[in-house]
Every structure is written in C-alpha cells, then in structure tokens.
Amino acid sequence: MSYTIQAQTRTEIGKGSSRRLRHAGKVPAVIYGAGKEPVSIVFDHKDIINIQTNEDFYTSVVTIVLDGKEVGVRAQAMQRHAFKPMIEHVDFVYA
C-alpha cells in the first residue's frame, strides 16, 4: 500500500513555533539522511493519524509531496503525546 502526505517546508524552527503548530492541528517533522541537508517540514495531523495505525506504514516508502515535489521517505521515529491520541513529531529518512 502506498501512502502520500502533503507537506510544506517550515520557516520557523524552535520549541515555541512547534507548540503553535501543534495547537493549530499540524505536526512538525524532519527529513534527513543520504548525505543531504536536513529539511524541516510540517503537515496536517489528520493526514498521518489514520495511516500510522497500519503496520506497513513503518516499513514501506511514504511519498511526501513537499512544495510540489515528491520525495520518497521512510518513518524513522515518531513521538506521541503521553495520553492523548496525538502525534507530536516525526523523523523521516530519505528512501
């Protein structure tokens, strides 16, 4: 099964901006690896909350549409809220 997430590049970095994004229903994330520069991104929480329940999300290549370009990535790490059904941050690596 293939998964696609629409994302935008983040311009503001830091704890305060990440909190504002989460409060607005967004998930901050980063894409790194393969000798490339890390890219900070943000996407809607609703885009990932349902697809992350499937086991193959963690092993298959996920397509992120980042500012009009498609990027193939794999989920490396995911931080979740302690008791709310909420994802706080995702680390992706280039596939």
UniProtKB/Swiss-Prot annotation:
CDD domains: Ribosomal_L25_TL5_CTC. SUPFAM superfamilies: Ribosomal protein L25-like. Pfam families: Ribosomal_L25p. Disulfide bonds: none annotated. One of its GO terms (cellular component) is cytosolic large ribosomal subunit. One of its GO terms (biological process) is translation. One of its GO terms (molecular function) is structural constituent of ribosome. The keyword Ribonucleoprotein applies. Keywords: Ribonucleoprotein, Ribosomal protein, RNA-binding, rRNA-binding. InterPro entries: Rbsml_bL25/Gln-tRNA_synth_N, Ribosomal_bL25/Gln-tRNA_synth, Ribosomal_bL25_long, Ribosomal_bL25_short, Ribosomal_L25_dom, Ribosomal_uL5_bac-type. This is one of the proteins that binds to the 5S RNA in the ribosome where it forms part of the central protuberance. NCBIfam families: bL25_bact_ctc, PRK05943.1. Belongs to the bacterial ribosomal protein bL25 family. Part of the 50S ribosomal subunit; part of the 5S rRNA/L5/L18/L25 subcomplex. Contacts the 5S rRNA. Binds to the 5S rRNA independently of L5 and L18. This is Large ribosomal subunit protein bL25. It comes from Shewanella sp. (strain ANA-3). The lineage of its organism: Bacteria, Pseudomonadati, Pseudomonadota, Gammaproteobacteria, Alteromonadales.
